Regions:
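Short, ordered coil/turn segments that flank beta-strands lining enzyme active or ligand-binding pockets
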Residues: 141
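Extracellular beta-strand/beta-solenoid scaffold signature
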Residues: 6, 10-30, 43-55, 62-64, ...
């Protein structure tokens, strides 16, 4: 496996420059990629994985993924966008964008959510502290989700089964 670490210069941060996507796994044309046994660490990007495109097939398997949004980052408004921290998928139910068997730690503000429009999120362990949970994902199964979530854990998801959820509702002070 490989290791991916987000790095930012102080000059870029002072100028307000932050990447939107950390790793793009498919965008245009035909993409078939599998990421296994990797370590991913990020802080300043908006979303770790971009997995969009009609012909994208992207699987993240058995990875250690951490994103902890610094307190100095501007708050997100969940009414003005999906604001996923982990991934934005292609909204297909064919298993083409999947994160599975991974250990995931996410920490963000009240306007952040775990993921949006993935085909599947399955068999993962998620430790979270953020505003929203999993949204518009086709299959959510066999996950252990613990920590703190302000709003719904599952929103507009189908195929939600066999998940162990131990979360507290809270409000992140701004």
């Amino acid at each position: 496996g490989c290791s991916f670490y987000e790095t930012q210069t102080q000059e870029a941060l002072d100028a307000g420059h932050r990447p939107v996507w950390f790793l793009t796994l498919g965008q245009s044309g035909t993409t078939d990629v599998r990421m296994e046994d990797c370590t991913v660490r990020a802080e300043y990007c908006e979303t770790i994985f971009r997995m969009v495109g009609d012909k994208t097939r992207a699987v993240v398997d058995n990875c250690d993924i951490t994103m902890k949004q610094p307190d100095s980052m501007a708050e997100h408004d969940m009414k003005k966008g999906a604001n996923p921290m982990l991934a934005r998928g292609n909204d297909r139910a064919d298993g083409s964008t999947v994160i599975q068997n991974s250990r995931i730690t996410l920490s963000g503000d009240n306007g952040r959510r775990i993921c949006y429009q993935l085909s599947a999120l399955k068999g993962n362990t998620l430790d979270v502290s953020l505003g929203c949970g999993i949204a518009s994902t086709k299959e959510v199964s066999g996950n252990t989700i613990r920590g703190r979530i302000r709003h719904k854990v599952f929103q507009d998801c189908s195929g939600v089964e066999n998940n162990k959820v131990d979360v507290r509702r809270f409000s992140i002070l701004g």
